[in-house]
Amino acid sequence: MNIEEIKNIKAKSNGTTLYEHTCMVIETGLKLLQSLSLSDRAQAFLKQNFLQAAILHDLGKVHPTFQKRLSGDKNASIRHELVSVWFAETFLEVNNAVLFAVATHHKSVESSSCNKSLSMQDLNGISISIDEGAYLPASEGTMCLETLQSWLSLFAEEFVYR
């Protein structure tokens, strides 16, 4: 998927694109981060981790099944945040805190007090599910390094590729 294709991917059923949504998340998060009284070192550390998590958090929405869901197909179901984790684990060197933030941005982990939870089995089983084709049909052509590189190039953030 090239840059122009990825810029037109929808993130919300109201037509908001993934790029627009991610830019809004980054802008809002950076304002919040700047409002905190933190040392320069802490600020820099949190900013780097936040930017990586923000840029990656909804990347799984490029998956064709998620796009079908946005188009109204009620039978299409996919955990886009787990696909986002798959991209990060497959192609990037990202720390566990960033992966955790991406994986749990819609659901908390089982041990928390929130009503919606993501089980550790969900997190541990993501690679197995993807390998078995449950999330990523190989014929779709969106789940590749080119898609990730196009996406990251929009934000000019430095990530270390595997």
Regions flagged by a language model, labelled:
Residues 2-162:
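Accessory nucleic-acid engagement/destabilization modules that flank
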